[in-house]
Structures are given as C-alpha cells and as structure tokens.
C-alpha cells in the first residue's frame, strides 16, 4: 500500500497563504485515501493545525521548545506566529460512498501538517476510475482572542484510477455455523495490492428486529479459523 501511495502524481493547490500538496492518494474497490501536506507558500514560520483547540503533539512541542500541555492556539500566541486551521479532503460521490469516512491531522518530523482522510467505497459503484472532489479549506485565527480572521476554500473535480482486484475467493461454510446468533452463509476474500478484504454474508434469525442492540451484536461478531 505504501508503494502505491508514494507513486501518486503530486499536485499543489494555493489556498490563501498556504500551499496544500497532494502527497499520496489511492483507491481500490473498497477504500479511497489521500494525504495532503500543508505549508506556508512563502516558507515563513506558522502553526498549521487540524483543530485549534487541541493540545499540540509531544513531538511538535519538543521541536518548538514549548510545553506539551499548551493548546495549539496558546503555542501560536506564545511564539507570536500566525495560526491556520486546515481541512483537506478527497471526497467521493454519494453513490460510491459506503457511508463511513475518517480524517485526521498529524505533524511529520519536519513540523509540516499532514491531513489524511479515508472513505469506504460501495464496490458495486466502483468502475475503472473514481470521480472525486478535492475540498481544501484554510482558516486563519487570532491566537490571542480565538477569533476567526479569514477563510479560504478551493474545490476541484478530478478522477483517480482504481487499483484492480487481483484475486477473489468465496469460502462456503458448513450449515449451522453461527456467530452471535447470526448464521454465517459465506465469507468472501478479495485481494488487492493494498491488502485482503474479507466480507461475510450473515443471516439474521427469523423475526429479529434490526434495532440498535441487534446491530451491536452484528458488529461485535467475529469469524475465526481453527488457528484463531
């Protein structure tokens, strides 16, 4: 997966005083992920964060020579540096989105902010390429007051190639195999360059209502072989 991510054609976007560079991205039949790196366009020092209210990381606090208990806003005020809040997403279409996504902002060893996001895909809606929309937003804040000063947004439509499925295997289980009351009909394994995805088809007991309790049982189910 890392080799595929690193093979990304890097692109840069000017968003206010920052340059957001698409360092890594990939998509297969199950997930789409991207990593944007944020830095000031003129290379001047600044505090770039994903959330201005959170504490600064231990590594970044050590690099800057400040107390790790300080919030990012307090660090910017203490060091008299501009404060920017970043959000950088590679969004997929609603039809291709399986309904779950994640995002996080982390600092690399050089102190640059990396904004990562991942979306789970609906396999039946994925073709040879995946339409995406880059949503890139930067907000500047006054560290002393917490007031938002300016807000910049850049949006762009694009497409990225889909990694092909390399192999697929369906495991049919003996009748009567169950987990948490759900009968296991089959387990399918799909192999991509990014890894192996397992999908189980489960049959709910007759008359079972798919309420919150039932869904909790479903999500806590586990299927293991004789070796665990």
Where do the model's predicted regions map?
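Alpha-helical, hydrophobic structural elements that either
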Residues: 1-228
């Amino acid at each position: 997966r890392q080799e595929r991510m690193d093979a990304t054609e890097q692109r840069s976007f000017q968003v206010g005083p920052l340059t957001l560079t698409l360092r890594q991205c990939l998509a297969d039949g199950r997930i789409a992920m991207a990593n944007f790196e944020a830095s000031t366009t003129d290379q001047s020092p600044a505090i770039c964060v994903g959330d201005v209210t959170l504490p600064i990381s231990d590594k970044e606090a050590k690099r800057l020579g400040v107390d790790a208990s300080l919030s990012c806003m307090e660090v910017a005020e203490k060091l008299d540096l501009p404060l920017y809040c970043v959000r950088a997403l590679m969004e997929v279409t609603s039809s291709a989105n399986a309904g779950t996504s994640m995002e996080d902002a982390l600092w690399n060893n050089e102190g640059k902010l990396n904004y990562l996001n991942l979306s789970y895909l609906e396999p039946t809606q994925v073709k040879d390429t995946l339409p995406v929309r880059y949503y890139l937003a930067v907000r500047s804040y006054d560290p002393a007051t917490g007031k938002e000063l300016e807000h910049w947004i850049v949006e762009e439509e694009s497409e990225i190639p889909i990694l092909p499925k390399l192999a697929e295997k369906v495991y049919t289980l003996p009748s009567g195999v169950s987990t948490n009351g759900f009968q296991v009909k089959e387990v399918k394994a799909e192999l991509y360059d990014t890894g192996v995805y397992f999908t189980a088809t489960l049959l709910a007991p007759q008359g079972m209502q798919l309420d919150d309790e039932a869904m909790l049982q479903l999500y806590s189910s586990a299927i293991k072989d004789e070796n665990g």
